């Protein structure tokens, strides 16, 4: 049946650019990729895009901690994210960043239209301010008790327990996440998006079929509570886009983050030249727009985002496809247990198709959480992919290759059975289309059981030993391989790597529309192992490596220790040879002919030493050091220098130049005391 090709734009939520992709993230990207691959197999024009969410205070602060520019940090993180997604065969057409000129331009455009249309309000507000860090605190940098359900340790914008949204000033007993200080209130002028003006439109959109019923019901609770104007402003210092004509004020990350979908697509249009941005984003667009997101960001995508689009003259999403969280072994992902598994760590140990299959087998169109039970994961992948599907090919391919030079029979051994398999296409297609991949997998595996039962009943290994039955053997094995081909066609959206190897073996593309025509009198390639069983030891090694990731992460430092790592270990006897003493600086003077050295005269409590020290740049007025106690190495061999003999070494910290700091003992220490 010929169908009219649809124009479809698909997005996944933008990963935040301050951390690695983990298996929780991968659920969404795998779910979306399976749906996209299915749509492409059916001939639809699909553009699949994503980007890094690269703005906000967390990125600014983390870059500061690392001692690098935010731009450098997000560039490195983008490269890592794209490598992980490629490793899982996520078939993005474009992966961009919200920190882009396209996004800056579109954010300014949308803000300008909203302002022009009267949907931007400005007023002076009192906001929490960190007196220790000298900065206003964004909502995600304040934690306290939820004002609605009284759950502790909640962020300043929304409660992860009850889902309520509120302002940071409503938190009970707030604390700065940055310094731990109790914030104080200060006034600042902010810009607000008039969300309540869109209440009627949003309620109609909510019940238009654009949302899952669970999401629509949750939104009704928010409508019943009353919508509030949305603060879209953040004060400097902030890493993001400065608001036009408002120096020192920046767009809140959640304003420009969803606009990043548009920015990434605009970037794709500019690169390709044959795509028209307006065809997908103008108000009367006939293209479909789908956002795959997690349930934790429903509020932003179901209220703010469609209202922003409506108020600025753009189209709204066709659907939001919302999924639940990932647990591992029945519990929240845990770094200490090794179940907080990064995508990169997984790929070092296991085939991406394994996780894609397991997620697909559990996913539905509902918002239920998915549990990655690692033992069940091993058993299901081995039982289904290896024992049922791939084994079907290996049981038959050997006879075809050895006895018939890789040539399949010219007729089907059981046309009625084959039709049973191809007739299932409609039901499986409907399951994929409605994001019921778990149901699709169940139907495919039921067919796999039938196919293996056919081979068991026909027993080609017995037929192969009987004289004069070569034609029967070829027909039976060809039937088995044709059934394998149908199964792998159905599984192609889920298992792209295995599908590619299968296509090489079958010497044909796995095409949904081609399954009604069996492979007859067709040449296949010599059979090679298509898929390896999962060994539980590999899974355990991955878990152990994830624990090591946590230890490594905890040990990663920036600043002095990173710049000058701890040197090789010495034993106590070596350390005991160094005699450090408290010394009084009796005199400190410049050294003629040297721009680095000071001449120090030190009193060790009965003995005077002369020491030359390279601290002149840090202490340009050496007289200020006189009368100060310090620490010196007293048994260092005298060193003859151009300016005289140096009889020891004073202890100082820092990289050098102006950044060097002479060590001083605590009060009570006296010249001559040994430092132990």
Swiss-Prot record:
Q: Which reaction does it catalyse?
A: tRNA(Met) + L-methionine + ATP = L-methionyl-tRNA(Met) + AMP + diphosphate
Write out the entry's keywords from A to Z: Aminoacyl-tRNA synthetase, ATP-binding, Cytoplasm, Ligase, Metal-binding, Nucleotide-binding, Protein biosynthesis, RNA-binding, tRNA-binding, Zinc
- Enzyme class, UniProt record, top EC level: ligase
Q: What PROSITE patterns does UniProt report for this protein, alphabetically?
A: AA_TRNA_LIGASE_I, TRBD
Picking any one GO biological process from the record gives:
methionyl-tRNA aminoacylation
Q: Where is the tRNA-binding domain?
A: 574-676
**Residues annotated as binding Zn(2+):** 146, 149, 159, 162
> Keyword Aminoacyl-tRNA synthetase on this protein?
yes
Record's keyword annotation contains Plastid: no
Name the Pfam families for this protein: Anticodon_3 (PF19303), tRNA-synt_1g (PF09334), tRNA_bind (PF01588)
GO cellular component terms? cytosol
What coarse category fits the chief subcellular location reported for this protein?
cytoplasm
Q: Which residues form a coiled coil?
A: none
Q: Where is this motif: 'KMSKS' region?
A: 332-336
State any single GO MF term.
ATP binding
Could you say which cofactors this protein requires? Zn(2+)
- EC code: 6.1.1.10
- Entry's cofactor comment: Binds 1 zinc ion per subunit.
Subcellular location per UniProt equals: Cytoplasm
Q: What does this protein do?
A: Is required not only for elongation of protein synthesis but also for the initiation of all mRNA translation through initiator tRNA(fMet) aminoacylation.
- Family membership, please give it: Belongs to the class-I aminoacyl-tRNA synthetase family. MetG type 1 subfamily.
Q: How does it assemble?
A: Homodimer.
Instruction: Give the protein name, as stated in the record.
Output: Methionine--tRNA ligase
Q: Organism source for this protein? A: Pectobacterium carotovorum subsp. carotovorum (strain PC1)
């Amino acid at each position: 049946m010929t169908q009219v090709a649809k124009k479809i734009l698909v997005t996944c939520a933008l990963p935040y650019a301050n951390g690695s992709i983990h298996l929780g993230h991968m659920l969404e990207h795998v779910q979306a990729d399976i749906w996209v691959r299915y749509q492409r197999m059916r001939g639809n024009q699909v553009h699949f895009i994503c980007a890094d969410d690269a703005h906000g205070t967390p990125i600014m602060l983390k870059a500061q901690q690392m001692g690098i520019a935010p731009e450098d940090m997000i560039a490195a993180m983008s490269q890592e994210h794209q490598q992980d997604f490629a490793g899982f065969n996520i078939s993005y057409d474009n992966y961009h960043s919200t920190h882009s000129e396209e996004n800056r331009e579109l954010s300014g455009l949308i803000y300008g239209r909203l302002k022009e249309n009267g949907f931007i309000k400005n007023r002076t507000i009192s906001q929490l301010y960190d007196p220790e860090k000298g900065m206003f605190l964004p909502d995600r940098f304040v934690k306290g008790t939820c004002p609605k359900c009284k759950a502790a340790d909640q962020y300043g914008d929304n409660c992860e327990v009850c889902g309520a949204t509120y302002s940071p000033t409503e938190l009970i007993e707030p604390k700065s996440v940055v310094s731990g200080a109790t914030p104080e209130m200060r006034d600042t002028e902010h810009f607000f998006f008039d969300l309540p003006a869109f209440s009627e439109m949003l309620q109609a959109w909510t019940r238009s079929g654009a949302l899952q019923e669970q999401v629509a019901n949750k939104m009704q609770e928010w409508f019943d509570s009353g919508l509030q104007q949305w603060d879209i402003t953040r004060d400097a210092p902030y890493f993001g886009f400065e608001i036009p004509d408002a120096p020192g004020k920046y767009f809140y990350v959640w304003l420009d983050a969803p606009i990043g979908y548009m920015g990434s697509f605009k970037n794709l249009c500019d690169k390709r030249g044959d795509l028209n941005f307006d065809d997908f984003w103008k108000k009367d667009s006939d293209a479909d727009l789908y956002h795959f997101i997690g349930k934790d960001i429903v509020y932003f995508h179901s209220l703010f985002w469609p209202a922003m689009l409506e108020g600025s003259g753009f189209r709204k999403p066709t659907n939001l496809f919302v999924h639940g969280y990932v647990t591992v072994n029945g519990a929240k992902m845990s770094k200490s247990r090794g179940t907080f598994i990064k995508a990169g760590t997984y790929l070092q140990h296991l085939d991406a198709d394994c996780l894609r299959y397991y997620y697909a087998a559990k996913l539905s169109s509902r918002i239920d959480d998915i549990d990655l039970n690692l033992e069940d994961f091993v058993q299901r992948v081995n039982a289904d992919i290896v024992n049922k599907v791939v084994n079907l090919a290996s049981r038959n391919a050997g006879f075809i290759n050895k006895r018939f030079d890789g040539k399949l029979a010219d007729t089907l051994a059981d046309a009625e059975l084959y039709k049973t398999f191809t007739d299932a296409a409609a039901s499986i297609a409907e399951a994929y289309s409605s994001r019921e991949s778990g149901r699709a997998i169940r139907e495919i595996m039921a067919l796999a059981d039938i196919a293996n039962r056919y081979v068991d009943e026909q027993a080609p290994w017995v037929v192969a030993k009987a004289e004069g039955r070569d034609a029967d053997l070829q027909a039976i094995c060809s039937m088995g391989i044709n059934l394998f081909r149908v199964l792998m066609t159905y599984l192609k959206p889920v298992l792209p790597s295995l599908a590619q190897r299968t296509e090489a073996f079958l010497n044909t593309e796995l095409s949904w529309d081609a399954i009604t025509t069996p492979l007859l009198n067709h040449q296949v390639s010599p059979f090679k192992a298509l898929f390896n069983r999962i060994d539980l030891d590999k899974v355990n090694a991955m878990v152990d490596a994830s624990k090591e990731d946590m230890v490594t992460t905890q040990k990663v430092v920036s600043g002095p220790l990173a710049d000058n790592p701890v040197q090789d270990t010495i034993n106590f006897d070596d350390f005991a040879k160094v005699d450090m003493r408290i010394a009084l600086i009796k005199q400190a003077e410049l050294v003629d002919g040297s721009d680095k050295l000071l001449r120090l005269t030190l009193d060790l409590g009965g003995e005077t030493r002369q020491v030359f020290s390279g601290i002149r740049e840090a202490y340009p007025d050496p007289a200020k050091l006189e009368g100060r106690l310090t620490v010196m190495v007293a048994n260092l061999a005298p060193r003859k220098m151009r300016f005289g003999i140096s009889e020891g070494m004073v202890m100082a910290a820092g990289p050098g130049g102006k950044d060097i700091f002479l060590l001083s003992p605590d009060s009570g220490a006296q010249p001559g005391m040994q430092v132990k």
